[in-house]
Amino acid sequence: MTSMTHAAPSRSSRLRIPPLLLLLAGFWLTFVATSSGGFESSDAELRLATASSWLEGRGGAIDSPSLTARTPDGRRFSFYGPLQSVVMVPSLAVAKLLPVSEATRDNAARFLITLVTQPLLSVLALAFCFGALRHLGVSNIASGKATVAVGLGTLFWHYARMGQEENLVALGFSLWLYGVSRYLKKDEWGLPWAALGGCVAIATRWAAAPSLLVMAALTVALMVRNGWARAKVLALSAALCAGTVGGLLGYNAYRFGHPLETGYGLYFQDKQLAFFVPERWADQAAALLVSPYRGFFLYSPLLAAVLVWAFVRARAVVFRGPTAPLNVLALLVLAVNVVFLSSYSFWDGGFGWGPRFLAALVILFAPMLGLMFERVRWGNGALALAVATQLLSVTLPATTENHARVAAVSTGARTCTSWTCGCSAICLRPGMSLNALRNTLAGRPGKLIAPRETLAPDQILLSSDYQTLNWWPVRLSFRMHLMHRFVALALSGTLWVLTALLMWQAFRQWRRASPAHEGGELSLAADFPPGRH
């Protein structure tokens, strides 16, 4: 009897799912539940076309005249970084094996990318974010809350599941943060991780370069302060960087005839557009920070709260403690990007929720968030409010407010600027989301639009995607009639309930566990009880 009594806890502990895995599974289900099942931007379509061109042996040349650069021989290439097209290739290859029509294969590829590839990349970014916080000495619970704050309490959530490249850039920043956090603990093998993060970011978007320059400067400063790593570690880090940059320059030369020609120059020259418009700098810089249209702090108010807390109540901890270099870096990277983007012709990033080009930067605020959640009592309430706010960003397509904006201006209903709240997502989303929920429950699908049908913005807003919840089960119900609307809502609700249960269980296990594993590796073993790893 005694032996059986002792055996039972041991067996249950072996069957226990590590809380980190539960948390990450909750993130994945959240991103899947709120995905539309398709792309919400033309950028993603161009990247898919590039991946398809590779598989067809055309070397990346595509037929679209929009947002492409034309070479002297008449071919057209996307001028975006190639990495997101690379990660689309497996889904596209699987879809091409299906015994269905070509159009169905294309839709299947989009479905796989938005429900599998994109959510997994976002979860991976958050996993390394959590690992970085643990290496910085933040407790499991505070690390978990900070990771939830980044993943669901900022504009990251919107871009984590819509097909844009922001989550892939965020993965690069997260890898860098993880590597540097290891290096701050005198672990020289953090440097290759940091180098890999920079490679991921620059291979995804050329405009990540200003951020990476600041991050590289901090990395070098830390190396000078801590002492240089061994030659083999430096060699591996340098090889990753050199190989990536060399590959990108070679791909540029193949596409556009010169290693330093990314395609942006050709595109702007062809369209006779100015790349930078410095005379608009002041207004657009302010708009990027606090405007209803694209204000970084209005679309992620939790980050505004943590900065107020840091400067008013916790300067010594945040800016003079062990994580001070990373906290200062987050502010520097934000400032550099605002200066750079505010003069850029397409500073607003096109369709999207808030300032798209700043979405990946929220990863860098994770250390500051971790410190806050360890020290304040109001953190849980602020986190709940932030998540509720961001839920509005995933109820409707990313293009919703832009269509509403164009429709209002074209009909003369109003004049829209960056400071007109009535033309912005932050003011339009609550009412439009509530209307979409009512229509979904009542079975009012709105107008069905034929594939590739061209309509005015005010007519597009009457379609099912904008009149009902933009979640893939609901879209399958209203657009393809594959299930009853209540079955679709039950499926979505089940995913939400599973998400809540998984995340609740993760934090429950952390609360019941023995003292946190100090400086744990980014591994599931770090979450097992002492003696089990």
What does each model-found stretch correspond to?
Residues 1-531:
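Membrane-proximal envelope and lipid/glycan-remodeling enzymes
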